[in-house]
Amino acid sequence: MKHCLTLISSILLCSVYLAHGQVHPDTALTRLVEGNARFSKGESIRPNQSPNRVKELAGGQNPFAIIVGCSDSRVPNEIVFDQGLGDLFIVRTAGQVSSYASWGSIEFANAVLGAKLIVVLGHTECGAVAAAVNVPEVPGHVVTLINAIKPAAQATKNLQGNRIESAVKMNVAMQVNQLRQLEPVLSKSVASGQTKIVGAVYHLRTGKVEFLSEEYILAAR
């Protein structure tokens, strides 16, 4: 019991301390947009990657944004947004499919570490989304990922154009809506205006991140 109380006290103190250093979600979004612009132009400045930064972070972390992204090795989040050590709290799974462990990680970064911007980041030519569209035979637990993405594949099956890329965007939009409604932490923080959750798609062939419009995301509910 004593250990539990100590842990709870530590978390609360951490929360209070970090609240003073929180970055407004709009400011955080601007940082990401500007960082990706540098990266896609080949003008990355690679901030916060010095030995001094390593030592500084040994005392704690204060990321300014949370990225919920795909595990694809071609989309390293810190690099495509031109950020450094301790800047981003990243949760990655194939197809950026979220479940209880992911939700707990996101809530921890939001409520305890103070990151008030959450970006759901998909990408073009996503293998997990392609599998949900084409429904091939897959091994083991891969089917759980495909099943989670199938609603996006079904919602876009009659659209003209590239069906996989349409499903990629729809999958991101549906995941944004899911997180916005996630109780009790995120839904309240979003409703109060403290937290912003947005969706984006990284384009493998250009290095550019496209942020989805709010109209598109709301239409996917």
Sequence positions of predicted segments:
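Positively charged n-region of N-terminal signal peptides that target proteins for export
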Residues: 1-5
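Bacterial N-terminal signal peptides
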Residues: 6-16
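Divalent-metal-activated hydrolytic enzyme cores
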Residues: 20-62, 85-86, 95-113, 130-221
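Active-site alpha/beta core segments
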Residues: 61-66, 72-78
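Structural recognition of the beta-strand scaffold that forms the well-ordered cores
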Residues: 66-69, 89-92, 119-121
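Short glycine-enriched loops at secondary-structure junctions
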Residues: 69-74, 94-97, 123
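Catalytic core of membrane glycerolipid acyltransferases/transacylases, capturing the structured
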Residues: 74-91
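Glycine- and Gly-Pro-enriched alpha-helical subdomains that act as flexible
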Residues: 119-134
